Amino acid sequence: MTPMPETSQTDRSALLAACNAEMQPERFKDYGPNGLQVEGRAQIRKLVSGVTASRALIEAAIDAGADAILVHHGLFWRGQSGVITGWLKERLRLLLSHEINLLAYHLPLDAHPVLGNNAQLARVLGLQATGRFGEQDLGFIGGRLDGETFADADVLSWQLEHALGRPVVAIQGKREPIERVAWCTGGAQSYFEAAIAAGAQAFITGEISEPQAHLARECGVSFFACGHHATERYGAPALGAHVAAQLGISHQFIDIDNPA
């Protein structure tokens, strides 16, 4: 779609349609609703993107004059009780009292080949995907964009910390040059076995659980937990900037830091 000249506003239905056209949420079996989660005002002048629909992000979006918020982690998830109390009540109160729309895309924003978290993390890390793996093809696998190899797991660990600006948890596999790297952002530690089966020499994700350390050592495949938030900072602003340019509205990414 050709970007529209910048105008003062669009309507909520056009914003939702633009996001859905890119994300194709109907293709995914997800843990919560994708698309519009909370309805606010009909006219949209400013879109704020962020990782999680936390109270801090909502308050920052209010201060920024947002009409809509676009996130990766929304408010509603499978298995919730459905009771609106406490922290959930407060987040909803802020959104509804300020008539702010909330849009959320979870797995669709992980999987998108250009705007998604995995694709955008690859851009930041200098990686290039040559294939997919795992349930719903959410995992990416490939190597360095420049065609070189990482000298070993220590070098890859240092480069991850340098690119993401935070320490990583690194479990050493074989001490060998690393050519084939797999990655899946966020809490995708359960994809490690699929990455091993796909032929990865190293796996990058956000979180680690107890079994992955043993698998890394026993299978000789290095495992890197780089932070759930840190690996998923890039999809929401990429999608937000993309649809804002299409619709001629303003966009701002607000990063609420999270050490997890």
Predicted regions and their residues:
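Active-site catalytic microenvironments in core metabolic enzymes, especially phosphate/sugar-handling
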Residues: 2-260
